[in-house]
Amino acid sequence: MSASTMKEVVYWSPKKVADWLLENAMPEYCEPLEHFTGRDLINLTQEDFTKPPLCRVSSDNGQRLLDMIETLKMEHHMEAHKNGHANGHLSIGTDVPAPDGSFSIKVKPNGMPNGYRKEMIKIPMPEPERSQYPMEWGKTFLAFLYALSCFVLTTVMISVVHERVPPKEVQPPLPDTFFDHFNRVQWAFSICEINGMILVGLWLIQWLLLKYKSIISRRFFCIVGTLYLYRCITMYVTTLPVPGMHFNCSPKLFGDWEAQLRRIMKLIAGGGLSITGSHNMCGDYLYSGHTVMLTLTYLFIKEYSPRRLWWYHWICWLLSVVGIFCILLAHDHYTVDVVVAYYITTRLFWWYHTMANQQVLKEASQMNLLARVWWYRPFQYFEKNVQGIVPRSYHWPFPWPVVHLGRQVKYSRLVNDT
């Protein structure tokens, strides 16, 4: 922030205050302080954060904002007292007429031989601040183990449920409105899986360039793990017949656990995809895992990429929508499988990020009904040290420098990580 701007801090408008809050990564205060001027801002005290609405914004009782305000006051004080000082002291000696009419005699106030006034200024120095967005890779590794465990459990559950699926000759497919209006397209499911792999690849590239990749990947693992855990439950409690007569399910093994283990390992190695030839079991219908990944990757891509890349968002949205439509067009899932998968995925993503972006929702209270979800304690553990909304910041994670092609831009969020 420039010195001229600091000099006028007391004259800041509410808009300038909001800009300062955004520049210092404190967007959560923009709404409660929307009518505050610069003078109101620097007059905030600890007592103000014990009363609404400020008491509901942050769990640190506004300490970070107060520290930033103290720094602001210090910079403002130094700027305001810079001019007219010599080495930090104001010269206040005055010339008085000498007996011969000249002005060579100086009055030395306070008895100081150099004519300077000794002034004591108390400037509170904020304590060294830890990162607002700590990486905490250990927590990320735990979240990864959780997601991996849920994925393995899902493959085990698919193998178990496969043994319970009734033969299509005994129990024909259930009626489905979409199937009544659209004939089956054989190659449609391959398009679905190709779109899914493209979205996962785009998300992986985007993740590599994210500055706060540890926090964001931790959120991804927590959400996708929970979604697959829910899927284990829904698959097990209700076994639906195959959606179409075209299904050729693997033979039942009737308790041969060694063969089942080999089949589970094959499914894990192939990523649970039909296009890799690893998934030829039946019964994993309610709800659709393909819909989960198509929806979740799009949501993360859009949430953690710049808003100006609207064309990128539309491309990813189109890949997701076409992929989901092709699931139904291939008659590989009932419509209810897709609807339930979309609903659960979007709700869990939005709930988790709403709670993560609001400090007050990270504290359990009678007013916070979201604290009653079963995964609230793990959520608190993973998110308690993340202060505020994670910026959509990017960096260059590789040792070689960025190659700029064409004209240079004035500003970019993509910088070298030095």
UniProtKB/Swiss-Prot annotation:
Residues 12-75 form the SAM domain. One of its GO terms (molecular function) is sphingomyelin synthase activity. The keyword RNA-binding does not apply. It catalyses: an N-acylsphing-4-enine + a 1,2-diacyl-sn-glycero-3-phosphocholine = a sphingomyelin + a 1,2-diacyl-sn-glycerol; 1-(9Z-octadecenoyl)-2-acyl-sn-3-glycerol + a sphingomyelin = a 1-(9Z-octadecenoyl)-2-acyl-sn-glycero-3-phosphocholine + an N-acylsphing-4-enine; N-hexadecanoylsphinganine + a 1,2-diacyl-sn-glycero-3-phosphocholine = N-hexadecanoyl-sphinganine-1-phosphocholine + a 1,2-diacyl-sn-glycerol; N-hexadecanoyl-(4R)-hydroxysphinganine + a 1,2-diacyl-sn-glycero-3-phosphocholine = N-hexadecanoyl-(4R)-hydroxysphinganine-phosphocholine + a 1,2-diacyl-sn-glycerol. Its EC number is 2.7.8.27. It is found in: Golgi apparatus membrane. Widely expressed. Highest expression in the cardiovascular system. The modification Phosphoserine is found at residue 13. One of its GO terms (biological process) is ceramide biosynthetic process. The keyword Metal-binding does not apply. It is a multi-pass membrane protein. It comes from the Eukaryota. PANTHER family: PHOSPHATIDYLCHOLINE:CERAMIDE CHOLINEPHOSPHOTRANSFERASE 1, SPHINGOMYELIN SYNTHETASE. This is Phosphatidylcholine:ceramide cholinephosphotransferase 1. It comes from Sus scrofa. The gene is SGMS1.
